[in-house]
Amino acid sequence: MINDVKFCAILTMRYINKSLMQSCHDNIDAHMPPPPKGLIAMRSFHISPDRGMSIFYFDTNENLNAAFPSMKEFQQYVAAKFHAKADAQKAITSSQSDFGEC
């Protein structure tokens, strides 16, 4: 088991028109803001042809809370531009249930 806790932002996107996903990725690559303070890792996932998810890991809850509004704002901008529905959540990893490193 892993003993340290990570503070996370989980951002999801569902594209109304799944053919826009690659254009959206290209736009994000070109316009991604600099990494926020305390960001230690990010993992992105394709869930289905029209859905994606990214998990951002922060070192402290304070850094997550400071970064979350601007992350959400950027996500909403992208969702509006590429006809998608976005959701953002905060989470804390479970040191009791974690296993391995990714």
Segment roles from a protein language model:
Residues 1-53, 59-73, 80-102:
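Short S/T/G/P-rich N-terminal loop/turn motif that feeds into the first structured element of a domain
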